[in-house]
Amino acid sequence: MVETTGISDQTKKVLIGVAAAATVAGVGYLVYKSFGGSDLERDLEEIKALGNLKFKEKQYDSALEAFTKGVEKAGPNSSDQIVAMLYQNRAACREKVGHSPFDILNDCMAALKVDKKYTKAYLRAAKALNDVGKKQDALAYLLAAFTLDSSLNKTNFEFFGKLLAIEPMSDCHIGKPLKIEDVKPQPVALFRIQQWCDTWDILDLFKTDLTRFEPEVLSEDQKQYQLALEKFKKGKYEELIDLLTEENSYPPAMILRGKMLSYSTDPNEATRYIDKVGAKINELIGSEEDEERKKLMRDAFDILKIELMYTMADLDKFLESVPKDDKERLFKLYSFASIFVVIRLNHFYSLKIWFQYNGCVLDTAVTNHEQQMMADTNNANRLLTEAEKNGTLTPHLSMIVTFLKLCTSEDYADVHRRIREMEELAESRSTHFNLVLMSKVYMMTNNEESSKKLLEEAARITTRYLVPSRHLQTADLHVHKPEAERLRLTTESANAAIAVDPFNFSAHVLHLLGTNGPEPMIKKENYERAMESIRNAALFAPPRELLMLKRMIPLMNAKKRAAEMLDMY
């Protein structure tokens, strides 16, 4: 649509749908003439008014001719804003008559050279850039338009989402956090430790040993293992890898070393280690005389194997290889596998809530995951069904089953029934896991007061690997607050989680939202912090979450460029 108001301040936000203003073009012209001005200005205004009239009458060739006459009459050195309108209006005509996107783009650029805060020119340039295959540039120009006029967000959301899915993602290199090599001891992924420990209402080798590990005679390898257990109790998880040496040949120590390597900055090291010592672990487990301890070690090793798998196909193949008559083993493995999937799903629901209330500029990152969320839900349900065939579900597993049914229910009465079932489970066993999950359900149903009470109760449990998830859940309490307050409190929640777990994926994504918010451009200080948040989040991000972070790189770069073009960086 062409620009029609001759005397308006072009630095003001221009709304899509400005066509209605065309009806008052004549009035605008008379007002302009009453102000006086140079002969050239009056001539250009007359030409623009004629072009607008022809455009309104759908005589696009005639309108294009008029705007071209105005551009030529203005000359190359004109800085009058009416010249920017002539270029932008000619670009609109070029669209209508089917001219090359390069010609459209050239007119938009000429308009922006005169008026660098011309909203319509940025929007039309973005579409032309997309048409010539320059999606990254198009994203920057679109965000500049969003910055000048936030009302464009909704009307151009589909276009924005298309630009955000920039390929190939191989060009989006994240890199390591700054000075990560200087961090001693090297960090481990606390959310992975939580994922493992959330199955501890099922008998576990390490839960058993943490409660009591007192062999009559301790070998040096067992002493090393005992010391590792003590450090685990104190929350010093990062120290375990250096403590449990590669030479240790005590099976529980070897399995624990493999687990901690899988939670490290280089999880492939765990695969290499298990490839090297796996046969020896199996041999040592087989020679264990205590049958109960043999089963515990075997199950612990099986769970480690699951943790090292990357695809559901690998997981299903492994589970199918377990003898069908070994129900106890099948129950434990299917139970852990379901938790393995559910924790990932839990991250998605949190991210969805945070993105939903922090503006559309990051929403698309979540919608890309919708199908995977449903796939994870289906896989978790399937694994839990198999677990239930082989044993009685524990309180945690029962809570998860009900939660999954709640998330997929479309019946109002059934939703309330599932919530009540979860409330009863949480009341009967007030573990940190149950309290935080129940608080999430309350937030999903807008029961902020009940959610807050449960989180306060959960705060009494201070086990280190549990604390970050509670802080992250606390962020959900602020989603309905005014934007400035919401962003401040969101940042506080993220910082609290990061203080305990410096490289928590979800916390850094939350921090990214809190420091940058929904703004379509970004200032220098926030840009540098945002990029470091992405690097920190990527350190332990699972493969799919890593893809989401990679998609944030072109977005942040486009935000930066938008700010630079508008002199706001």
UniProtKB/Swiss-Prot annotation:
Carries keyword ATP-binding?
A: no
List the SUPFAM superfamilies hit by this protein, alphabetically: TPR-like (SSF48452)
Name the domain of life this protein comes from. Eukaryota
Chain ranges on the Cytoplasmic side, renumbered to this chain: 33-569
GO CC term (a single one): mitochondrial outer membrane
Listed transmembrane segments:
13-32
Among the GO molecular function terms of this UniProt record, one is: mitochondrion targeting sequence binding
Q: What does this protein do?
A: Receptor that accelerates the import of all mitochondrial precursor proteins.
What name does this protein carry? Mitochondrial import receptor subunit tomm-70
Query: Which species?
Result: Caenorhabditis elegans
Read off the lineage from the record.
Eukaryota, Metazoa, Ecdysozoa, Nematoda, Chromadorea
| Name of the encoding gene | tomm-70
